[in-house]
Amino acid sequence: GLESLTTGQIDLAGFDITRMHEDMLAALRRDHVGIVFQAFRLIPSMTAIQNVAVPLELAGRADANAGAADALESVGLGHRMTHLPDQLSGGEQQRVAIARAIAPRPQILLADEPTGNLDSGTSEKVIATLLGATEAAGAALVLVTHDLALAERCGRVLTIEDGMITDDRTTGLKGDAA
């Protein structure tokens, strides 16, 4: 739903999204999908709680601030709610991004190289937060990574080379992640 397909179709929540116009796609993403980007994509002039509240406000939730506070607590940042992004470390910024993605309680969480620009110690904490938050929310996680050890922590691993699936296997671990 973020990029146009050249062939095939994508079914999500019972809908063929390749046939939807942009307004319908935006509503589907808002209601069913959370996204964590490699580059945190936080709004610099907004505090952590304001950044996390954005998708809740867009969904018309009256409890946007309470939901944002709960999500920040769940990723261990309850004490940093009023801080601006430039007052947070890289790992903290990524945890704010995770909180923003899980706050609306999506069915699917997409994470594109969520630790790509973090050091190894911070990466482990962010991944533990991401996996724990996904499980707690009962969401499926679709994780894009070049880190094979991280991929092995997921329940299902798809290997894609030159745009084609070259391997599809389960790891025996609990979860829907790929």
Each PLM stretch: what is its role?
Residues 166-178:
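ABC-family P-loop ATPase nucleotide-binding domain
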Residues 157-169:
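H-loop (His-switch) and adjacent beta-strand-loop-beta switch element
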